[in-house]
């Protein structure tokens, strides 16, 4: 494969041995002499297509400008004369996440205008968001356990990638290439079972009357690296027990009230009967033999 002919600065890049110790020494010397410090350790940080370029060192007497390009485009400046050591390049990649990008960090003196001969810069590694962005932690949107069927729905994660002004979800971008793995087990055991789907929904057979725990993981099998996401939060079914507990909070007090009412009613009736018998005895004539 032919290496893309990336746009270049009109002056040669100064070679620096990429070691942390030498980099620190050069930073101190450059800072003392008022020379722009050459950036190093350029690293891409990307999750669900939110992409940030990071580098070192923190500036002393210099500022940074970040540029980005593709093999077929000129360099475009994004972050101008900043003192931070990171630049968010998401918006530049969002319209075409399958393109391969190259960035460079240019170090300048604070009062420099334009790209002068004393500016120094470093190129980033090439980066293709579609292949290299990390998959974020998925979220279980809903679940339902009915009889012997467990239905689990995974939330369709939205990203900052877009097409025709519309933001895309992971499913929009990867289609059937995005799969989810469900790990599930009876809450009373530890042995896990798995199920795979290329949609966002699972419907699996389970044992009736048992509670289950489960989590999901996003997977892109076609990738060489970064195939799997972190595991989602583990959740467990408690639907039937939950309903029983909710009903008990209502039914038990009602039953107690009914029992009290019945007891009071019986007590009142008993008192009335006793009073009636007492009145009858007092009104009867004496019987003298």
Swiss-Prot record:
Record-level GO BP terms: blood coagulation
Motif (WKS motif): 44-46, 75-77
Job description of the protein: Initiates blood coagulation by forming a complex with circulating factor VII or VIIa. The [TF:VIIa] complex activates factors IX or X by specific limited proteolysis. TF plays a role in normal hemostasis by initiating the cell-surface assembly and propagation of the coagulation protease cascade.
Pfam families for this protein: Interfer-bind, Tissue_fac
Gene3D superfamilies: Immunoglobulins (2.60.40.10)
Keyword Signal: yes
Compartments in which it is found: Membrane
InterPro entries on file: FN3_dom (IPR003961), FN3_sf (IPR036116), Ig-like_fold (IPR013783), Interferon/interleukin_rcp_dom (IPR015373), Tissue_factor (IPR001187), Type-II_Cytokine-TF_Rcpt (IPR050650)
The encoding gene: F3
PANTHER family: INTERFERON/INTERLEUKIN RECEPTOR, TISSUE FACTOR
Source species: Cavia porcellus (Guinea pig)
Membrane-spanning residues: 248-268
Coarse class of the protein's main subcellular location: membrane
Lipidation (S-palmitoyl cysteine): 271
Cytoplasmic compartment residues: 269-289
SUPFAM superfamilies cross-referenced by the UniProt entry: Fibronectin type III (SSF49265)
Protein name: Tissue factor
Single GO molecular function: cytokine receptor activity
GO cellular component, one term: plasma membrane
Glycosylation sites recorded in the entry for this protein: 41, 111, 151, 164
Cleaved signal peptide residues: 1-32
């Amino acid at each position: 494969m032919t290496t893309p002919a990336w746009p270049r600065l009109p002056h040669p890049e100064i070679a620096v041995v990429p070691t942390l110790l030498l980099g620190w020494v050069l930073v101190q010397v450059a800072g003392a002499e008022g020379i722009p410090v050459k950036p190093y350790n350029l690293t891409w940080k990307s999750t669900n297509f939110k992409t940030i370029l990071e580098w070192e060192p923190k500036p002393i007497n210099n500022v940074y400008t970040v540029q980005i390009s593709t093999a077929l485009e000129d360099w475009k400046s994004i972050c101008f004369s900043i003192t931070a050591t990171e630049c968010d390049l998401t918006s530049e990649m969002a319209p075409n996440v399958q393109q391969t990008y190259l960035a460079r960090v240019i170090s300048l003196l604070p009062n420099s205008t334009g790209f002068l001969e004393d500016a120094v810069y470093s190129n980033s590694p090439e980066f293709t968001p579609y292949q290299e962005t990390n998959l974020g932690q998925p979220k279980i949107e809903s679940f339902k356990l009915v009889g012997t069927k467990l239905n689990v729905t995974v939330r369709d994660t939205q990203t900052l990638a877009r097409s025709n002004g519309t933001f895309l979800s992971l499913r929009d971008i990867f289609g059937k290439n995005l799969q989810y793995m469900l790990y599930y087990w009876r809450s009373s055991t530890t042995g896990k079972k798995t199920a795979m789907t290329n949609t966002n929904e699972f419907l699996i057979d389970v044992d009736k009357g048992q509670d289950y725990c489960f989590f999901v993981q996003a997977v892109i099998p076609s990738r060489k690296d970064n195939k799997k996401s972190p595991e989602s939060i583990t959740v467990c079914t408690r639907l039937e027990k939950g309903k029983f507990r909710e009903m008990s909070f209502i039914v038990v007090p009602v039953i107690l009230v009914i029992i009290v009412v019945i007891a009071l009613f019986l007590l009142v009736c008993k008192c009335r009967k006793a009073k009636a018998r007492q009145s009858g005895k007092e009104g009867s004539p004496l019987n003298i033999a």
